[in-house]
């Protein structure tokens, strides 16, 4: 069963510019994953320090493979997570 994930990041204001430079590589590598169906990153128009990541994977195993991937660990865990004020993850299912 497909896994759809919505993630909200609130970045420390002083770090937003730095974090934005890391996103193209993260998106490029994630989209190359065998189990990735969709991956997109959005920035709030009201608060540029807030990002929404929309991800879809073929199944739970593909989602876990993403979280364990070298690029996720290197970019998200090592370079982005330390600068987040807030991180909320929603695993959702499509209703309509």
Features from the language model and the residues they span:
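Residue-level preference for beta-strand/loop junctions
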Residues: 1-3, 33, 49, 83
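Short, well-ordered beta-strand segments in beta-rich or mixed alpha/beta enzyme
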Residues: 3-10, 40-67
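N-terminal first-folded block
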Residues: 3-31
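Short alpha-helical
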Residues: 14, 48, 71
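Short secondary-structure capping/turn segments at boundaries of alpha-helices and beta-strands
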Residues: 27, 38-41
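An amphipathic, aromatic/His-enriched active-site/gating alpha helix that lines ligand/cofactor pockets
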Residues: 34-37, 56-90
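Short hydrophobic/aromatic patches at helix-to-coil boundaries
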Residues: 92-96
């Amino acid at each position: 069963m497909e896994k759809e994930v919505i993630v909200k990041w609130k970045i420390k204001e002083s770090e937003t510019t730095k974090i934005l430079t890391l996103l193209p590589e993260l998106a490029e590598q994630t989209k190359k994953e065998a189990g990735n169906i969709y991956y997109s990153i959005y920035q709030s128009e009201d608060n540029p320090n807030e990002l929404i990541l929309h991800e879809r994977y073929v199944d739970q195993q593909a989602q876990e493979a993403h979280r364990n991937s070298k690029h996720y660990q290197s970019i998200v865990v090592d370079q982005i997570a330390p600068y987040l004020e807030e991180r909320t993850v929603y695993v959702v299912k499509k209703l309509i």
